[in-house]
């Protein structure tokens, strides 16, 4: 702790050395970041960061160890393994590793699916609302992504998926737990069953909705081959904090790396350290798992309240999701439309060829009652 205190003292000591112009630049950045603290912030998945998480970010910066040379950092390795075991327990997988985000995780999972497939097919199925990183990954890997239509709830239509699988057996099926657009959850059990019938890889992109696993609100996930989760979205953690979990072990790379004591695993990431997981570790260490669960429950409760307020007080079209995103469409554009979008209070998306408003409850500080009242301010 003395080293941490010394670092904090050093930071405090250099503050008076900043010129007025430098201080103004720093203040402008801090002021810009305050947008995430607002009880009206519901435009996007960026969260406010708790003090315990901020401490973990500072610890990672001070430590700065590179786990490609894991033998030098046994404490860091131990913390990483503790967290991975925690994730595996909640998501019913057997091993995994941290990544810089689910865009990287989705690419790696499809890489594994492609290279370990016993078929010649290159087709990957996912919903029409699948995250764009899946489409990018398929382009990079030479795979053929084919979108499956969604139902009126924004979920992948399981009948359409079944029909597609009968016509062309896929290499992989992507199931999303919390689409970025509407927060919808694809029919997981149907995806598992079809993947098993087709001997295809089933990957779950739970970047946004993975927090539901902590609430025991997801089905048996052990049938998935791989799962991505982004704590920097649903767990209110600092970026980057993402994890990619696998049901089966990964082999080592068949590449000579004479300067390393251990042969790297066949994963996308190279150099990394505590920046990917120490903030989350600090959060769990200092506030506990139950605090994280309460955070998820509180933000989902506010999303539910916001949906209820719209249904009880308007005749607007409104779409509720279990992951904390509420989409709605008033009869006419809101009076303060531009300000709502500019201030990050709401965002827009497309649903069934209509432009709709989107409220993302990423923070448990977002207050549904205040947010609803803001819609009618002139």
Task: Annotate each PLM feature.
Residues 1-93, 346, 354-357:
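N-terminal entrance/gating region of PLP-dependent enzymes' catalytic architecture
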Residues 56, 81-85, 107-111, 135, ...:
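Predominant activation on well-ordered alpha-helical scaffold segments within soluble catalytic domains
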Residues 64-71, 93-97, 120, 145-148, ...:
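Glycine- and acidic
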Residues 170, 197-199, 224, 238-241, ...:
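Active-site lining segments that contact anionic ligands and/or coordinate catalytic metals
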């Amino acid at each position: 702790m003395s080293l941490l205190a010394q670092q904090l003292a050093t930071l405090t000591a250099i503050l008076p050395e900043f010129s007025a112009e430098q201080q103004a630049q720093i203040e402008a950045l801090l002021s810009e970041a305050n947008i995430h603290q607002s009880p009206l912030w519901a435009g996007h998945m960026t969260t406010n960061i708790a003090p315990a998480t901020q401490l973990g970010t500072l610890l990672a910066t001070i430590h700065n160890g590179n786990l490609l040379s894991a033998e030098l950092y046994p404490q860091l390795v131990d913390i990483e393994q503790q967290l991975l075991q925690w994730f595996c327990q909640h998501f019913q997988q057997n091993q995994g590793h941290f990544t810089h985000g689910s865009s990287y995780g989705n690419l790696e999972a499809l890489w594994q699916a492609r290279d370990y497939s016993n078929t010649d097919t290159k087709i990957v199925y996912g919903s029409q609302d699948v995250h764009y990183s899946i489409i990018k990954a398929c382009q990079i890997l030479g795979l053929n992504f084919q979108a499956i239509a969604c139902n009126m709830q924004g979920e992948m239509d399981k009948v359409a998926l079944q029909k597609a699988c009968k016509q062309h057996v896929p290499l992989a099926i992507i199931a999303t737990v919390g689409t970025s657009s509407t927060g919808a959850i694809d029919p997981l059990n149907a995806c598992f069953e079809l993947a098993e019938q087709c001997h295809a890889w089933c990957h779950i992109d739970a970047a946004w909705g993975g927090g539901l696993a902590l609430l025991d609100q997801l089905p048996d996930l052990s049938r998935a081959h791989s799962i991505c989760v982004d704590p920097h979205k649903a767990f209110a953690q600092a970026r980057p904090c993402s994890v990619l979990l696998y049901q089966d072990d990964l082999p080592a790379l068949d590449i000579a790396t004479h300067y390393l004591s251990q042969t790297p695993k066949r994963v996308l990431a190279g150099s990394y350290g505590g920046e990917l997981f120490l903030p989350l570790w600090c959060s769990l260490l200092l506030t506990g798992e139950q605090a994280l669960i309460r955070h998820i429950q509180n933000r989902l409760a506010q999303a539910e309240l916001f949906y209820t307020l719209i249904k009880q007080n308007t005749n607007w079209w409104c779409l509720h999701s279990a992951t904390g995103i509420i989409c709605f469409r008033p009869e006419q554009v809101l009076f303060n439309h531009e300000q709502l979008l500019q201030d990050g209070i709401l965002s827009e998306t497309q649903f069934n060829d209509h432009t709709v408003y989107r409220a993302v409850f990423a923070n448990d500080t977002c207050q549904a009652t205040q947010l609803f009242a803001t819609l009618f301010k002139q």
